[in-house]
Amino acid sequence: MKHAEYEYLNLCRHVMEHGTKKEDRTGTGTVSVFGYQMRFDLSKGFPLLTTKRVPFRLVASELLWFMKGDTNIRYLLQHNNNIWNEWAFKNWVESDEYKGPDMTNFGLRSQEDEAFKTQYDEQMEIFKKNVLEDDEFARKYGYLGDVYGKQWRAWKTAAGETIDQLKDVIEMIKKTPDSRRLIVSAWNPEDVPNMALPPCHTLFQFYVADGKLSCQLYQRSGDIFLGIPFNIASYSLLTHLIAHECGLAVGEFVHTIGDAHIYTNHFEQVKKQLAREPRPFPTLKLNSDVKSVFDFEMGDLTIEGYDPHPAIKAPVAV
């Protein structure tokens, strides 16, 4: 049987060979396709890619951050997770309070200008230190808007109340597992203009059959090289956690992507990854003493048997 990682590798190859060239808001440029689906049987290993190292620690701490309903990067920085830094940093350097060197277009400039990259790195360290140590600074500039965690755990209604979508869907899985309404949405049109980055993974749905829990994610926009490997692992982990609380086995993770794209400055990295052979997927171990998904901490999640090829670095488009 073909290794399940080819679901992802075939996506990479398909977009490289058949993608349409497009411009994008970051100024980097992409090749993309519209509408693509991958399927992973979670009972046959945890889909943490092996053709390059994907840091499970970062995947897990980000998911726990979402599940806490948090929208400030301080929690992530406290767990040495820097994957959301650039979007919060952008808010600071574009504010009237910022007095440092010009950081306009820092995403591209830091890749092309070594002298600028030194300045950028210095300012980023100042920013991170301030978020960690200064409560007022963290409140103003660590906040990303009403992104995933807020929509999952405290969706605002017209009546001024909030809906805990994640808690509600878990209760529905327990009480009405055959429901076709086991859905959580992160796309709130009213809040989108005020988000640092509008949700890329916009909606997910659960499905229970034969004692197994499956999850399908609809992702409006997918950065194939950097983002999608994280998304595969994150929603697979979420499925495991919810199945654990609900007393179910895991079924499939189905990943449906709208605009699936590769940035032009990731082409060489993708080619390098495609030249590698997949290795066996690892196994996820959960602390069985933890009963609620909302009580899991980093020490309760363990990956065993992960032996990937080396990491492949690539710039983030902001």
UniProtKB/Swiss-Prot annotation:
Pathway: Pyrimidine metabolism; dTTP biosynthesis. It catalyses: dUMP + (6R)-5,10-methylene-5,6,7,8-tetrahydrofolate = 7,8-dihydrofolate + dTMP. Its main location: cytoplasm. It is found in: Cytoplasm. The keyword Signal does not apply. Its EC number is 2.1.1.45. CDD domains: TS_Pyrimidine_HMase (cd00351). DUMP binds at residues 25, 180-181, 220-223, 231, 261-263. One of its GO terms (cellular component) is cytosol. It holds the Pfam family Thymidylat_synt. (6R)-5,10-methylene-5,6,7,8-tetrahydrofolate binds at residues 223, 317. One of its GO terms (molecular function) is thymidylate synthase activity. The keyword Cell inner membrane does not apply. The active site is at residue 200. Keywords: Cytoplasm, Methyltransferase, Nucleotide biosynthesis, Transferase. One of its GO terms (biological process) is dTTP biosynthetic process. Belongs to the thymidylate synthase family. Bacterial-type ThyA subfamily. NCBIfam families: PRK01827.1-2, thym_sym. Homodimer. Catalyzes the reductive methylation of 2'-deoxyuridine-5'-monophosphate (dUMP) to 2'-deoxythymidine-5'-monophosphate (dTMP) while utilizing 5,10-methylenetetrahydrofolate (mTHF) as the methyl donor and reductant in the reaction, yielding dihydrofolate (DHF) as a by-product. This enzymatic reaction provides an intracellular de novo source of dTMP, an essential precursor for DNA biosynthesis. This is Thymidylate synthase. It comes from Bacillus cytotoxicus (strain DSM 22905 / CIP 110041 / 391-98 / NVH 391-98).
